Amino acid sequence: LTLLRERKAPTIHDVARVAKLSKSTVSNVIRNAPGVSAETRARVQAAITELGYKTNIVARQLAQQRTRVLGVVIGDLANPFYAEMAKLLESFAAARGFQVMFCNTQVDEEVELAGIRSLLEHRVAGLLFLAYAGSAGGAQAAVGGNLPVVFVTCSADWGDVVAVDDFGGVAAATQHLIGLGHRRIAYFADTVIEENADNDRKAGYIRAMTRAGHRPQLLRWDAKPDTVIADGETRSIRSVLTGPGRMTGIVAANDLHAIDVLDCADRLGLSVPGQLSVVGFDDIAIAGLARIGLTTIAQPKEMMAQIAIETLERRISGALRGGRLRQITDFTFVERTTTGKAQE
């Protein structure tokens, strides 16, 4: 019988022997350290190619007590906005030599905290939050003060922030409806009350309504089908959109909520924008489809993702030190076909 022995993988010692250089010189070439001549680099590369040597990137990074991996905490991947932002973050991270690990929390504090701890166990070099449930303070305690953190499209009282002007965006959306003659305009959000972007957006709506002398009306989905919470009471969506004193304009906290409202209007036989005008927020890809044509506030997703990755990389490298950065980008008002002049 012929016994086949597994070929031993070449080591850095083998590369040094073939290149006729010291192990430390070979290591400098592999690490792309400065001060190494082009001739020496060529000799090492030739030896690596001849032997089929592969560097153990993970082992090398762990030995240096860091990895080139970033953790991204996502609120809900079912929301296209988060999915679009996650893709952009991954792309910009890859361009800078980082890999990305994702944690989908459903904006649940316990799930969020467990996910953060898992990312920390993988020794991520930094964290990016696309949504922040708060984790009852546990997230900040788990992360500590040494790991760079950037909040993207959301905010907290710790870490750097990259976000759009949420307040100004919703104020502009509300003013647009007021300018079209609408008076009964509601702000529509989810049952999950977030302590960051949603509060700023809600405040922008309230400011615009009160300055125009109109009564703000806050709505959010109830747990029961086709019902909402209005003024602390459970009401049917039908009564809000078709009953006495019905709403003629809706400003939604995001595009998904706006599309939900459009669906309700369709089932109730309401014409949009004839009987109801709707504005969203985010400008997700499907908002621009001809069958939807959603008027919305566009976030500069690509710009925010790029700024977030650059900020985190500078924190990791030590090029950026000092206090928290809060970088706020401008929004773009995108008028499509779901808004029109008030008919009553």
Give, region by region, the residue ranges found by the protein language model.
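N-terminal helix-turn-helix DNA-binding module of bacterial transcription factors
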Residues: 1-68, 343
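Short beta-strand segments enriched in small/hydrophobic residues
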Residues: 18, 23-28, 62-78, 176, ...
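Short gly/ser/thr-rich secondary-structure transition/capping motifs
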Residues: 50-56, 110, 130-132, 231, ...
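Secondary-structure boundary/capping motif
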Residues: 36, 81, 111, 196-197, ...
